[in-house]
Amino acid sequence: EIVTDGSVIAKQCEFIEKVHSMGAEVLLSCHPGISMNCEQVVGLALFLEKRKPDIIKIVTLAENENDLIESFKAMVMLKKEVKTAVSYHASGVAGGLSRIVNPILGGHMVFCVDRYNEGSTMEQLDLKTARTVIDNMKKIM
């Protein structure tokens, strides 16, 4: 769900300013729950950027390989088009690889778990594995 109500957006902006005035940073997270093409993801990021967060996090759905490839394309374009730091990946049956590839393509951060337990999100890699994969990929890029 994406908030488009002007009064709600104004309240979000006020809250973000308040957090900034206290010396903290704001991560604005949006999980639309649908597949989106590159242009839609970039448009969403630019729409969210107007609220002036420090980091924008977007998670879309990848139901198949085409959605996954579109997420890679979107990450490359996000890096070029959006000034604010962006963390973007896809969830769903085909989205797992975007959690590693998108940070390599310029995503701001990787969401991981320190160790798995009963409440862990199993789609997230453990921190040690993610670090090893990304560090080794960067060596060949």
For every predicted segment, state its role:
Residues 18-28, 49-55, 79-83, 103-111:
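Glycine-enriched alpha-helix->loop->beta-strand junction motifs that scaffold or abut catalytic
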Residues 6-20, 36-40, 63-78, 96-97:
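Active-site-adjacent beta->alpha loops and helix N-cap segments on the catalytic face
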Residues 76-141:
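C-terminal alpha-helical cap/extension of soluble enzyme domains
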Residues 12, 41-42, 126-130:
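Well-ordered, non-membrane alpha-helical segments in soluble/globular domains
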Residues 1-12, 25-36, 54-65, 89:
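Catalytic beta/alpha-barrel core
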